[in-house]
Amino acid sequence: PRWMRPCAKGPGWPPMRSLAALMLLALPAVAEVSPNRAAELEHLVLQDCGSCHGLTMKGGLGRPLTPEALAEADRDSLALIVLDGLPGTAMPPWRPLLTEAEALWIADYLKGETP
């Protein structure tokens, strides 16, 4: 899909992404985080992600992150992008700061699917 094209850059990246996606399948269908952590993650998305993707997530330095723009994106791939960044782009990895469940919560949030 078009939204995922930057992921294909860099040798060895697609196989690693596929392996990590398989590992994410073991996590719940809806990422579970505490209400307090969910509030912290929402703040992180609006402040940190918004600094590149626009405060309304409609795009800026980074691509738009609205539910409409991510309609074709699957949550596992989005979570991997959050965790590992996009090599060769300004998108940094957040794995040192977030768990896989938190990255899935962010993916659900961006797609408008959080409980």
Positions of PLM-derived features:
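Sec-dependent signal peptide recognition
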Residues: 15-22
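Positions in alpha-helical segments
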Residues: 39, 47, 63, 89-92
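Extracytoplasmic electron-transfer domains, predominantly the class I c-type cytochrome c fold
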Residues: 59-60, 67-115
